[in-house]
Amino acid sequence: MTENTKDTPESETGWRCAVCGFLFSGERPPRSCPRCGSPGAEFLPAGDHTVFRYDGEPFDVLLINGSSHRVGNTGFMLDCAAEELNARGVSFRRYNLSEYSIEHCWCCYSVKAEYCTYPCRNWQDDMPGFHALLATAKAVIVASPINWNNMPGRLKDFLDRTTCMQNLFHLDKPGLTEGKVVGILVCGHEDGALKTALDIFLYFQQMGYILAPFGIGYRTHGAEFNSSTDSGFFRNDQRVREDIKGVVSNVVEFMQLDIESQLKGRLAPVSE
């Protein structure tokens, strides 16, 4: 194993851990990351990053995995969500934030409100592509782990970067998100699930999203267990699947009422 793939033989391939960035040379990824311990499934082919942009194809629901781990418990929750959307014939797109380059918000608003514009002034990373996805999707389902009773920093950076969409209302410009639907899924080892969900929702509420009825689903394992047993618990617990199916179903039912079109131009934007 090596962290230098510049001289990788033709028979080998460069792999990058999506969690910590460790580079590995070999025909296939390692069984686990030598640096952060993540399973080999977290590795992606290494190579030059292509800036992400939305291709313009319409779809209904945007699925966001806010975890640093693509294939962990949070990813499993989105697997279940995707299964339910497929079963209902609802179009969707799924993204793992760990696979994309999303920089910290520049906080242009703190300098001058007019500087926080849409499109975002930072057009060099992948977030402008996600801005377009948010403007297009009728509904969003966000899945998040619990990090210290809150969402992980990766997801917070993503949500911080939606400020340019929220600021449209302060600049008296047409909004792009009011009346859309949001659902939230949270999992973790112990405490903080509901707080995490509500912290996430506050961002969307400030953009005019409506939380689907019974639109929050969460499950924790417990501090008395070793975290290495969480994966087996979540994948074998029937309540997890039922709750996710319920949240997804509620989001879809609410979305199909087309509240967004009914409220267009009728809402008074009240946000920070």
Residue locations for each model-derived region?
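N-terminal beta1-alpha1-beta2 submodule of the flavodoxin-like/Rossmannoid cofactor-binding fold
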Residues: T2-E3, G21-F22, R35-G37, P45-D172, ...
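The −1 position to Zn-ligating cysteines in a subset of zinc-ribbon hairpins
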Residues: R16, S32, H104
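Cysteine-rich micro-motifs
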Residues: R28-P39
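Mobile beta-alpha loop/short-helix "lid" or hinge segments that flank ligand
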Residues: L97-E103, P174-L176, M207-D230
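Short, glycine-/small-residue-rich phosphate/pyrophosphate-handling segment
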Residues: L171-G217
